[in-house]
């Protein structure tokens, strides 16, 4: 299956790509020129790239933050400087789709499509999590329609594979209503979250979700596990091998590609 690495830190991406000869690199190409990426791909033609796209959240560090900050819904609890965003806004949708086009032009064949859990947040409500609202949240159904539009446009018109990261509540609906569109999924923290072993119930929940999705896709189930314990890694890898899943172990909360 070749190498599998994830790197979302700008200064680490190019060194990681240069080390890889084949396999899949999942990167955030923001701030990296298409020429740089294409030069690497020319030297390593067996290397495949998926690029990061964040349709449901806005990060303060991004160059477009000021332009879209009026669409912030609430702070993202686990990441400083990140906010859930109103994906139903047409200007934002157009921007995200154009970003997908730019990423394809750089050499990506697919997207790591993050934070579709916004659908769940709008469905279940932000208030119960003690979140201070910055604007009224859109309805879950309107979020669903917006995400469906973005995904279908990116796959059918832009021509990129969409690999959602997480978002099981959204995907259980989308994959039934639009079968054969999603062909690969990514899931973080099935066994470990923030370098702590998950409860049995949480692990079983995510295992069940990944197995459900696997029956409906032709591509791979990919996991990111935040775990440094070698014995636990061995057990997880054996489980993934039995189920024909791919797994990447990260030593850091930020994905650095090591």
Question: Predicted segment positions?
Answer:
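Glycan-processing catalytic domains of CAZymes
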Residues: 1-258
């Amino acid at each position: 299956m070749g190498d599998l690495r994830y790197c979302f830190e700008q200064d680490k991406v190019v060194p990681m790509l240069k080390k890889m000869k084949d396999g899949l690199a999942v990167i955030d190409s923001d701030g990296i020129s298409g020429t740089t990426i294409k030069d690497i791909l020319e030297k390593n033609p067996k290397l495949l790239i998926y690029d990061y796209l964040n349709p449901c959240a806005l990060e303060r560090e991004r160059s477009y933050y000021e332009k879209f900050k009026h669409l912030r819904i609430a702070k993202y609890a686990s990441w400083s400087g990140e906010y859930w965003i109103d994906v139903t806004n047409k200007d934002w949708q157009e921007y995200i789709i154009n970003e997908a086009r730019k990423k394809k032009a750089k050499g990506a064949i697919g997207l790591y499509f993050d934070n579709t859990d916004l659908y769940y947040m709008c469905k279940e409500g932000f208030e119960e999590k003690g979140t201070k609202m910055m604007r009224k949240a859109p309805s879950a159904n309107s979020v669903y329609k917006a995400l469906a539009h973005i995904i279908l446009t990116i796959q059918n018109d832009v021509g990129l594979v969409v690999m959602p990261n997480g978002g099981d509540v959204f995907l259980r609906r989308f994959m039934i209503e639009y079968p054969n569109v999603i062909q690969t999924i990514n899931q973080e923290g099935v066994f470990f979250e923030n370098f702590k072993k998950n409860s049995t119930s949480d692990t079983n929940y995510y295992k069940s979700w990944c197995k459900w999705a696997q029956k409906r896709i032709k591509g791979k189930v990919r996991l990111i596990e935040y775990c440094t314990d070698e014995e636990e890694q061995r057990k997880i890898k054996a489980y993934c091998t039995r189920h024909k899943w791919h797994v990447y172990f990260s030593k850091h909360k930020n994905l650095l590609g090591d």
